[in-house]
Amino acid sequence: MSMKYLMLLFAAMIIRSFADSGNAIETTSPEITNATTDIPAIRLCGPEGDGYCLHGDCIHARDIDGMYCRCSHGYTGIRCQHVVLVDYQRSENPNTTTSYIPSPGIMLVLVGIIIITCCLLSVYRFTRRTKLPIQDMVVP
């Protein structure tokens, strides 16, 4: 994993941690100490961000320069360009699990059918190969 992706991952974690909270900035000087109004940690991109994110919202982080994407459900990637496969999507209900692995019983039946088919084919080939041709019987 390159350093660029690690930095992007770290930035995404920061963006998510500040996504729902606005933080007040406090300015101090020797004479004046006051709290300013809340500045949102992230804000949506303006018209310059239209079309930047393929399946999500374009956002600007307060502490980080550049545009980032907040992907819609089922998409991932820097610009939300990758579809998350159905097998790997988390269910909306955390108590349910979805398994796409065939049960051992089905696997055993399939393996058994394959073995029986191979045995029958080998017996058929062996008997066909060893069958002696019928010789004409000559009556004296």
From Swiss-Prot:
This is Pro-Viral epidermal growth factor. One of its GO terms (cellular component) is membrane. One of its GO terms (molecular function) is epidermal growth factor receptor binding. GO terms for biological process: epidermal growth factor receptor signaling pathway; positive regulation of cell population proliferation; positive regulation of mitotic nuclear division. Induction: Expressed in the early phase of the viral replicative cycle. Keywords: Disulfide bond, Early protein, EGF-like domain, Glycoprotein, Growth factor, Host membrane, Host-virus interaction, Membrane, Secreted, Signal, Transmembrane, Transmembrane helix. InterPro entries: EGF-like_dom (IPR000742), GF_C11R (IPR011170). PANTHER family: PROEPIREGULIN, TRANSFORMING GROWTH FACTOR ALPHA. Disulfide bonds join C45-C58, C53-C69, C71-C80. The record marks T96, T97 as: Cleavage (By host ADAM10 protease). The chain crosses the membrane at residues 101-121. Residues 19-100 are extracellular. Glycans are attached at N34, N95. Residues 41-81 form the EGF-like domain. Residues 1-18 form the signal peptide. Cleaved at the cell surface by host ADAM10, thereby releasing the secreted form of VGF. Residues 122-140 are cytoplasmic. Disruption phenotype: Higher doses of VGF- virus than WT virus are required for intracranial lethality in mice and for production of skin lesions in rabbits. No effect in cell culture. SUPFAM superfamilies: EGF/Laminin. It comes from the Viruses. Belongs to the orthopoxvirus OPG019 family. Gene3D superfamilies: Laminin.
